[in-house]
Amino acid sequence: MTVSFVHLRLHTEFSLVDGLVRVKPLAKAVAGLGMPAVAVTDQSNMCSLVKFYKTAMGAGIKPICGADIWLASREEDGPLSRLSLLAMNAKGYRNLTELISRGWSEGQRNGEIIIERDWVKEAAEGLIALSAAKEGEIGHALLDGEEAKAEALLREWMEVFPERFYVEVQRTSRVNDEEHLHAAVALASRCNAPLVATNDVRFIKQEDFEAHETRVCIGEGRTLDDPRRPRTYSDQQYLKSPAEMAELFSDLPEALENTVEIAKRCNIEVQLGKYFLPDFPTPNGMGIDDYLRHASFEGLEERLEVLLPKDTPDYEAKRQVYVDRLNFELDIIIQMGFPGYFLIVMDFIKWAKNNGVPVGPGRGSGAGSLVAYVLKITDLDPLAYDLLFERFLNPERISMPDFDVDFCMEGRDRVIDYVADAYGRNAVSQIITFGTMAAKAVVRDVARVQGKSYGLADRLSKMIPFEVGMTLDKAYEQEEMLRDFLKSDEEAAEIWEMALKLEGITRGTGKHAGGVVIAPTKLTDFSPIACDEEGGGLVTQFDKDDVEAAGLVKFDFLGLRTLTIIKWAMEIINREQAKKGLEPVNIDFIPLDDKPTYSLLQKAETTAVFQLESRGMKELIKKLKPDCLEDLIALVALFRPGPLQSGMVDDFINRKHGRAELSYPHPDYQYAGLEPVLKPTYGIILYQEQVMQIAQVMAGYTLGGADMLRRAMGKKKPEEMAKQRGGFIEGCKNNGIDADLAGNIFDLVEKFAGYGFNKSHSAAYGLVSYQTAWLKTHFPAPFMAAVLTADMQNTDKVVTLIEECRHMKLRIVAPDVNNSEFRFTVDDDGRIVYGLGAIKGVGEGPVEAITECRAEGGPFNTLFDFCDRVDLKRINKRTLEALIRAGALDRLGPHYHDELKAYQATVDLNRAVLLAAMEEAIQAAEQTARSHDSGHMDLFGGVFAEPEADVYANHRKVKELTLKERLKGEKDTLGLYLTGHPIDEYEGEVRRFARQRIVELKPARDTQTVAGLIVNLRVMKNKKGDKMGFVTLDDRSGRIEASLFSEAFAAAQSLLQTDALVVVEGEVSQDDFSGGLRLRAKRVMSLEEARTGLAESLRMKLHADLLKGDRLRWLGELFNRHRGSCPITLDYTSADAKALLQFGESWRVDPADDLIQALRDQFGRDNVFLNYR
């Protein structure tokens, strides 16, 4: 039977919001229905084109490439209409690409991509157009009863697309389908225009309709049962078979036949798999190959001046090693046709370095290239660390080289901008990414559109483990609680069922973290482009894999935060060096064998050190005790699940410290020739490069062939491995190596190849880790100031880093509008000055306003002076309050003294006055500004005019803040306590039942009691599945980790919250691993609970005068509200009597904080306290 239908209108998941068709299932479904071709016409984009083309061709289906577009209305405020375009040939494909790209760059309005009809006319060649049925402008006219207008429009489009314009009809059970169809058929007949039938496909199977509706509602932010929601789609818009379409259009067979005719007319070949590099301009007409050689040997001489002074023993022989390696690499690069690639990367890195943008020493396998090193693309000598070029560029496996380049976060966009200027702004773009509906999010989204409760969605979502790559199926398999919940809750099961259908569907677009493409001509010759509404933020519509398949070469411009930290630290250091008349420090020339740096590393004091700051890494460092850069390089490779779980890590450490025999590679089967290869890792096969070198040394492989072997081992295909094993043993035999030994070593290599790490990457990043450790060792304050600045928006991280500063004995100065900058800085006394940008609610704009005023008019004197001088349009009341509560205006208050003790004694009154005066200061400043603008006299003029005037006179009697209020203000604005500690308020009291501070604890078998603030809490499960907790306590003297095993944890769980003050009873012991102490908790109490159990009485010292009037009644009511078991005693004095009174049992109270504070507020702090046994 002849196929009588091809689908020509279809939206995939890349028609964001209104398509549910996935590309791979589409090709399979089309083939299954016996159709020879299918079109994809995504709305206003061609994002799926390469995926669709490759998948369809692979399934033996002819791909027809097209797009649906929104056409601008002829009237100013008229409705948009659709038009569907299909590419007939290469010219049509190019025109469609240009048209879609132009829509993005010039036609964005109100969130839609709108195409002007003149643009369509200019791009019509090579395109077939379908009228888009009732959604097209002809359809609009027909349904409005304007037949003459519809005819005029049709004739106009038939002129634009001669013999290539089709009147489209649909029967999808949607409103007006039939009315449009009958009118369209009559119109087509009058104008002698061909008809075409489509099913406007949105999903593959009919049962997917509900999932599609859900997806649309998620995109539109509506619920499924919203009565105002337009019902745009029907359950008939699925991928119908030719038979179903034949039955549906039995009265219009020509409309079906025309789909096949159109499919025959559309013949495009998308060129994939061929690379196109932009031309690199060479000087003096030199050929690109010659110029690469010239630049490389010039760079080698520069590098050798530092690496290999001419008085080095065996200078010529050592130099020749570099020359030979360089010639070898250059021959391969030139043979493979990649000189231009290297020169382009060299060029933009050179520009970055010359323009103050720090560049990383290397990343990935590119660090293995000597050519890259001499061209200053990388900064690590590959010969010194046995890094292999073939790991980067293998002549036996043709693929593009791929340099990942790290730039300082601040300067990365400047480098991209330079490249755009150098190669043409229409030739340079970043790359699109597609966000998908991930497990946790899709559950919440589905619940929302189904109208389910937030609580149910939250509960269900939280049952899905928070793990990279987590899927709904995986979560269901892993979590018994989730399975039970879904079985017991019908609504949850309904959410889950729908979420499974939508999981993984494309949800939105983004920008690739680092990918940049540089085209040899304009970008649209290779990929359609997208951008933001202003025409900026250019991205290719093809993702990174598709854009490379289309022929564009991807360059990775990655932002590495650590480079920014190093840059900021160096700026602070070299400013100080200049003040002292010292030479600037150059991070690229620091010694790599610095003993103090390795001492810091061996103690695992690696908080803020790149790659080495996690808890697990610190534990590994303490065991390994690195003493050279090779050890640091190994650390990064060792700290991964494979090596950690295989026993390789312990073996490595034991061999390093002489606790296990060094063998190359195994005690039972050794080959002496492997010692040079494996010596840096104590005989352990740790790196992919070592796998390659073993194959070279033992079996005579070329390094290119060895790289192929390494890749084969990574894939673990049994047939391939058997073949490789035979080749390896044969090669060994040819080198006189016993077959059994060769087989055993091959098996060992195969086992470890799965764990092998790219040494080039590890070495380059190991160097950055060393640089940060060196800075922390030798310039701790500038380094920590830079790290704090980098993390200032992450409050949790700032808290950790401030604690680290305290541990390092670094002094920290509170934020201060007269001294602080936006960033953290270091003052002349070596103290870290808190950055204003780290105060919550104070952004870059307000800080700029403050620093500009300070630069113009000097330090601020009072709050009133501050408000008068800064621009209050940039600093609002909320910002001002945050500055006061953070302590940044302390020096502007009435009670500030330079002597720290005096300052601390009055800080609570100071901040209370500032908060009270804030409103008046703002009003005074605003009035002054208005008066100044109008030329009138200022009612508040006296506040600012007289230097000696007491501007705080109206507010001096304000009640001072309590310690708790002051510290809460700091916690709210800074995320931490800066001028005190919550335990300070209870210091005298807690010493009665926790007699030792944390710093004074010693290991003992007796139960000891500790009071402290919970600053960190980790919860995990033991082997039985019971929860256990690890709580870090801080009492300002020190910290200790308390472990709570299942029973103790269950009993205390409600008390275990960050920032809670608790009392812990337990056994203190030595932690041999960390070298510190640990506490095994037996019991955890709140402060109130400890008071109740240990306090003898609540005691008050009161004079008769204090008990006059309503105070007795107030006291009775207060005690009534706090009934408990603690006795009350009263030291009573009057003019003629003195007595110690014991209140009766009916007046016992619960000695809670708010009771004690209320009594102290009323009678004075020193007159109310607890007596302990």
Curated annotation (Swiss-Prot):
Question: Which Gene3D superfamilies does the entry mention?
Answer: 1.10.150.870, Bacterial DNA polymerase III alpha subunit, thumb domain, Metal-dependent hydrolases, Nucleic acid-binding proteins
Q: What is its main location?
A: cytoplasm
Q: What is its EC number?
A: 2.7.7.7
> GO molecular function terms here?
3'-5' exonuclease activity; DNA-directed DNA polymerase activity; nucleic acid binding
InterPro entries assigned? DNA_pol3_alpha_NTPase_dom, DNA_pol3_alpha_thumb_dom, DNA_pol3_finger, DNA_pol_IIIA_C, DnaE2/DnaE/PolC, DNAPol_HHH, NA-bd_OB-fold, NA-bd_OB_tRNA
Q: Which Pfam families match?
A: DNA_pol3_alpha, DNA_pol3_finger, DNA_pol_IIIA_C, HHH_6, PHP, tRNA_anti-codon
Q: Which domain of life is it from?
A: Bacteria
Subcellular location field:
Cytoplasm
Q: Name the GO terms of the biological process aspect.
A: DNA replication
Coiled coil regions in record = none
> What are the UniProt keywords, alphabetically?
Cytoplasm, DNA replication, DNA-directed DNA polymerase, Nucleotidyltransferase, Transferase
Q: Which GO terms describe its cellular component?
A: cytoplasm
This enzyme catalyses:
DNA(n) + a 2'-deoxyribonucleoside 5'-triphosphate = DNA(n+1) + diphosphate
Q: Which family does it belong to?
A: Belongs to the DNA polymerase type-C family. DnaE subfamily.
This protein's assembly is summarised as:
DNA polymerase III contains a core (composed of alpha, epsilon and theta chains) that associates with a tau subunit. This core dimerizes to form the PolIII' complex. PolIII' associates with the gamma complex (composed of gamma, delta, delta', psi and chi chains) and with the beta chain to form the complete DNA polymerase III complex.
| Role according to the record | DNA polymerase III is a complex, multichain enzyme responsible for most of the replicative synthesis in bacteria. This DNA polymerase also exhibits 3' to 5' exonuclease activity. The alpha chain is the DNA polymerase.
Q: What is this protein called?
A: DNA polymerase III subunit alpha
